[in-house]
Amino acid sequence: MHNISFKLLLLCDLFLSSSSVRHNLAVGDVCATNEECRINCQCDAAYCDLSCNMCVYMLHVMDTIDANIPNQPCISEYQNCGKKTSSLQ
């Protein structure tokens, strides 16, 4: 009986921790300011699209050769960053 209780406790813990991780990832897309997106995307080229309150990041920083650009390149695989836009738009 003790073994079943321990397994049940572990299962509940796993469920609760996975729920909180999914919640944290979903919150990253929602924004009200550009600063929130820069923090969530971990790059300076991110901004908040106020039409849908979603973080957007541009890849133009990766395409430049100028070493004086202060922007950090956005990491396209970063989960909390929202959607990509082309620098040609």
Swiss-Prot record:
Family: Belongs to the DEFL family.
Signal peptide, first to last residue: 1-20
Coiled coil: none
Keyword Membrane: no
Chief location bin: secreted
Subcellular location(s) of the protein: Secreted
Cellular component GO terms held in the UniProt record: extracellular region
Organism ancestry: Eukaryota, Viridiplantae, Streptophyta, Embryophyta, Tracheophyta
The name this protein goes by in its record: Putative defensin-like protein 254
Biological process, per Gene Ontology: defense response to fungus; killing of cells of another organism
Domain of life, source organism: Eukaryota
Swiss-Prot/TrEMBL keywords: Antimicrobial, Disulfide bond, Fungicide, Plant defense, Secreted, Signal
Disulfide pairings: 31-48, 37-55
